[in-house]
A protein has these predicted regions:
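Alpha-helical scaffold segments that flank or form the walls of functional sites
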Residues: 45, 53, 63-117, 141-156, ...
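C-terminal cap of metal-dependent C-N hydrolases
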Residues: 6, 335, 345-373
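Divalent metal-dependent hydrolysis catalytic cores, especially in the metallo-beta-lactamase
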Residues: 56, 72-101, 117-130, 157-169, ...
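His/Asp/Glu-enriched, well-ordered alpha-helical/loop segment
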Residues: 228-238, 256-267, 272-356
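N-terminal metal-binding scaffold of metallo-dependent hydrolase/deaminase domains
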Residues: 1-33, 360, 367, 372
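Active-site core of metal-dependent hydrolases
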Residues: 155-275
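Active-site gating loops and adjacent loop-to-helix segments of metal-dependent hydrolytic enzymes
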Residues: 76-87, 130-158, 200-212, 223, ...
Length: 373
């Protein structure tokens, strides 16, 4: 099948042309191809399927439940909404609960049900966090960095654990980072660290910052904190929740200037994503969704109720150049979980996961493996 007459997102920009789909993969991207059955895109934009490397749940299901049926439901919702690959994030919970969830992820990765987003990784969000900046994490299960516990979970995930989070100020964080970064990306998260403490962990091998601005100190001219330490290291990529509630539009634009080509848009979506207002749970705590905002009973903002596609569109609406917004939701997150050669781009040989959209990025159609959903 040939797709012609579109604006194809290749190499960080939109280029007039087309591509073929052969055996579920891209072929002849922006190149001439033999005549055959074709689709006229009529000038529509085509972007890669999105990659969400930090999503907890949707449709009433949560990754940490460890329920296979729920994970399938999550993956189907994501695919329908233009997110064709994902790495679900766990919560701060007992190790045996996390191990069950990770083994469930391995099962979905292997089976790869038709019509579902591809599970290509896991983000281990917790339990190595600061109590002061725990946010919506359950304080009862917070722990100091423990490489042996991490290794147990890494083995349970059979190579799928791609991001592990840690608060730099905790005892043992630097040594943990040195060892864990040999196996996966280490991210600074849920932290009250000083600039110096954060810098030590980045210099030990951390290359990621979980949900920039949230659950960490803000920038102060005498105390630049983890944001200052991260921004001046070109090896560090920063996640950003762009649901319109977690981060002000001005701070969204600032992030793209502080971290050029190093912003990774995420949803941080909870099980209430795609659901009506009401009461839900997160890591053993009640969460209340009202007007698109999810909060704990004490008013603390929890994760989001938005999917990544909506977050990408929000970024563009807030003034981020469209090309940068698309990169931040596709190629950059794919890179962060070590899957740049498998997803996140429109290139010969990669799975034909793509979204047909208009100039405002409004979806017209989603294709997974070259098949329209």
């Amino acid at each position: 099948m040939r797709f012609e007459n579109g604006l194809i997102f290749v190499g960080g920009r939109f280029v007039s042309g087309g591509f073929s789909v052969e055996d579920g993969r891209f072929a002849h991207v922006l190149a001439d191809a033999a005549d055959g059955e074709s689709v006229d895109l009529r000038g529509a934009r085509v972007i890669p399927g999105l990659v969400d490397v930090h999503t907890h749940g949707n449709s009433g299901a949560d990754f940490s439940d460890g329920d296979y049926g729920g994970l399938v439901k999550m993956a189907a919702y994501l695919a329908k909404n233009g997110v064709t690959s994902f790495a679900p994030a766990s919560m701060t919970l007992p190790y045996d609960v996390l191990e069950t969830a990770f083994r469930t992820a391995v099962r979905l990765h292997r089976i790869a049900p038709k019509g579902c987003a591809r599970l290509l990784g896991i983000q281990m969000e917790g339990p190595f966090f600061s109590e002061k900046k725990k946010g919506a994490q359950n304080a009862a299960y917070l722990r100091l960095p423990d490489y042996d516990a991490f290794a147990r979970l890494y083995n349970a995930a059979e190579g799928l654990l791609r991001i592990a989070d840690v608060a730099p100020e905790l005892s043992g964080a630097v040594e943990f980072t040195r060892r864990a970064s040999e196996k996966c990306t280490v991210s600074v998260a849920h932290t009250d660290a000083s600039y110096e403490e954060a810098a030590a962990v980045f210099d030990a091998g951390a290359t990621h910052l979980t949900h920039l601005y949230n659950a960490m100190p803000g920038i102060h001219h005498r105390r630049p904190g983890p944001i200052g330490a991260a921004s001046e290291r070109e090896s560090v990529t920063a996640e950003l929740i762009c649901d319109g509630h977690h981060v002000h539009p001005s701070a969204v634009r600032m992030a793209f200037r502080l971290f050029p080509n190093r912003v990774c848009l995420i949803s941080d979506a909870l099980r209430c994503c795609g659901m009506p207002d009401g009461r839900y749970t997160l890591g053993g705590q009640d969460v209340f969704l009202s007007g698109g905002v999810a909060r704990l009973s004490d008013g603390t903002i929890a994760g989001s109720a938005a999917n990544l596609y909506d977050c990408m569109r929000n970024a563009a609406a807030f003034g981020v150049p469209v090309e940068q917004a698309v990169l931040a939701a596709t190629a950059i997150p794919a890179r962060e979980i070590g899957r740049a050669g498998e997803t996140g781009s429109i290139a010969d040989g990669l799975p034909a996961d793509f979204v047909v959209c208009d100039d405002t990025l409004a979806r017209h159609a989603v294709y997974l493996g070259g098949e329209r959903l």
